[in-house]
């Protein structure tokens, strides 16, 4: 079991790392080419569209993965479920687009940017035909990885080649969603291999309505919880430059979160299968393994990014002087690499397979209220104090994330406490402290002027120090890898 999971984990991590590298190549170029105000406008409009993407999806992918993974070996049963979920998602997409149009034509500031918003909305309109959840349920991680890398590499090359100035905003917006369009075309072409398009009925929608509704509300609350900070900031800062600073500051954190949460695609089908089989031994082992990977990645990332905040944001922004507040925002939000990722894993790997989504919903309701209220309150305070509302919004988001994680640990304590609080976690913390000290010495003691060289040196030396310290401590992941190599 573990070897198969390890392969899937490695494939997903490689995919996410490559996609991250491609983002790092194109994003600084875009920041420098568009400028803070135009980039802030894009981020603000994209955040608005993202709300309706969530309505269009309505939590359907998560439920579809769970249900399709149960019948993955029966082509007709699988085809029936695929057709059912496609119809449900198509209806929700039409509803989402209608609501978005009402919003755009009702709010003056949104109407002024209607062309940009409608270009970005293509992303969720065409996503209806992606069937990505099917390939995840079938555990086609190698196919997903190759396809994603190829399409994003193509789009990144086009962005770097064609986006040159602030007037290229609409061109960039289209190129940013082009990878989704290409992914959909490839998925539809490959779909017939796994399912039939012939009618397989009668359809049974009723059994999905309650779980989809719960997961939809969860997705909506998660969006409010995650994206409202940017949206509120857009109203607090009319120039949108603070939104751009916030976007640059949070970019590297989002990369770490994406790296960890990409593993959901590996763990959800397996966790669902083990729980359905009532195999608590494998279920608990999978939970602990998932948490170990999360901590293994997040702890050293927090340590190194805290020490290299100026260098990281300078590279992400393309060296522009318009992003002066980005480093402090990164430092404030850096713990989200761990807190958000753990919260996501508790939901996806524990609560969702157990069909206890409602507990996550209650926690997110609390988080959304705290984040909205805190962002407005602290954002206005920092706006009046030093005209930096982004810092106030970042503090509110960071505190809310910690509260949400604590609540989820309490809710799922039967499966989470032992998997999270153990000797192995302590070993990872010790390794993280070693990385923190190493990063501090390289960042502030060794005289290196080039930001890229400093980051590469910190990552390389820090990685060696981290792995060696964990090997000496006999940390589970590192020690099991060493033993496997020595066999």
Residue ranges and their predicted role:
Residues 125-148, 335-366, 414:
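Membrane-interface junctions at transmembrane-helix termini in multi-pass inner-membrane proteins
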Residues 3-62, 97, 101, 152, ...:
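Signature of the first transmembrane helix
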Residues 104-120, 240, 305-338, 342, ...:
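Interfacial segments at transmembrane-helix termini and the short loops linking adjacent helices
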Residues 1-23, 76, 202-218, 288, ...:
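N-terminal membrane topogenesis motif
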Residues 238, 419-424, 439-487:
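Membrane-proximal transmembrane or re-entrant/amphipathic helices at the cytosolic face
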Residues 31-39, 109-111, 138-142, 146-184, ...:
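Membrane-interface helix-loop junctions in multi-pass transport and translocation proteins
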Residues 57-73, 253-291, 344-352:
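Helix-loop junctions and terminal segments of transmembrane helices
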Residues 1-2, 145, 169-176, 185-227, ...:
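Interhelical loop/hinge segments that connect adjacent transmembrane helices in multipass membrane
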């Amino acid at each position: 079991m573990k070897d198969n999971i390890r392969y899937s984990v490695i494939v997903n991590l490689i995919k996410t790392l490559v996609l991250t590298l491609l983002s790092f190549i194109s994003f600084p170029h875009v920041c420098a080419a568009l400028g803070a105000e135009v980039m802030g406008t894009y981020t603000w409009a994209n955040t608005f569209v993202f709300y309706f993407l969530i309505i269009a999806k309505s939590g359907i992918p998560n439920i579809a993965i769970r249900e399709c993974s149960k019948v993955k070996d029966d082509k007709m049963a699988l085809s029936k479920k695929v057709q059912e979920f496609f119809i449900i998602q198509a209806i929700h997409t039409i509803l989402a687009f209608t609501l978005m149009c009402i919003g755009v034509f009702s709010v003056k500031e949104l109407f002024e940017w209607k062309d940009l918003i409608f270009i970005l909305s293509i992303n969720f309109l065409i996503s209806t035909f992606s069937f990505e959840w099917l390939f995840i349920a079938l555990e086609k991680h190698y196919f997903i990885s190759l396809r994603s890398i190829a399409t994003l590499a193509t789009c990144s090359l086009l962005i770097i080649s064609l986006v040159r100035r602030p007037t290229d905003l609409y061109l960039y917006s289209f190129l940013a969603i082009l990878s989704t369009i290409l992914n959909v075309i490839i998925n539809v072409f490959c779909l017939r291999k796994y399912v039939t398009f012939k009618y397989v009925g009668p359809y049974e929608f009723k059994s999905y309505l309650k779980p989809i509704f719960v997961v939809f509300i969860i997705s909506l609350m998660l969006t409010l919880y995650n994206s409202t900070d940017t949206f509120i900031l857009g109203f607090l800062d009319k120039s949108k430059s603070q939104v751009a600073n916030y976007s640059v500051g949070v970019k590297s954190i989002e990369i770490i979160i994406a790296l960890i949460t990409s593993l959901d695609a590996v763990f959800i089908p397996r966790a669902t299968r083990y729980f359905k089989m009532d195999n608590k031994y494998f279920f608990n082992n999978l939970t602990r393994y998932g948490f170990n990977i999360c901590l293994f990645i997040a702890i050293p990332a927090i340590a190194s990014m805290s020490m290299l905040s100026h260098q990281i944001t300078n590279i992400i922004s393309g060296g522009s002087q318009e992003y002066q507040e980005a480093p402090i925002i990164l430092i404030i939000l850096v713990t989200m690499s761990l807190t958000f990722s753990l919260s996501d894993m508790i939901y996806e790997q524990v609560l969702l397979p157990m069909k206890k989504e409602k507990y996550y919903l209650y926690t997110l309701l609390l988080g959304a209220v705290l984040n909205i209220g805190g962002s407005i309150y602290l954002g206005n305070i920092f706006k009046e104090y030093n005209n930096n509302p982004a810092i106030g919004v970042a503090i509110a988001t960071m505190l809310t994330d910690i509260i949400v994680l604590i609540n989820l640990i309490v809710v799922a304590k039967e499966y989470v406490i032992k998997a999270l609080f153990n000797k192995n976690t302590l070993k990872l913390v010790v390794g993280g402290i070693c990385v923190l000290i190493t990063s501090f010495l390289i960042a502030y003691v060794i005289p290196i002027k080039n930001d890229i060289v400093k980051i590469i040196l910190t990552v390389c030396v820090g990685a060696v120090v981290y792995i060696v310290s964990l090997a000496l401590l006999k940390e589970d992941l590192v020690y099991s890898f060493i033993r496997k190599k020595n066999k």
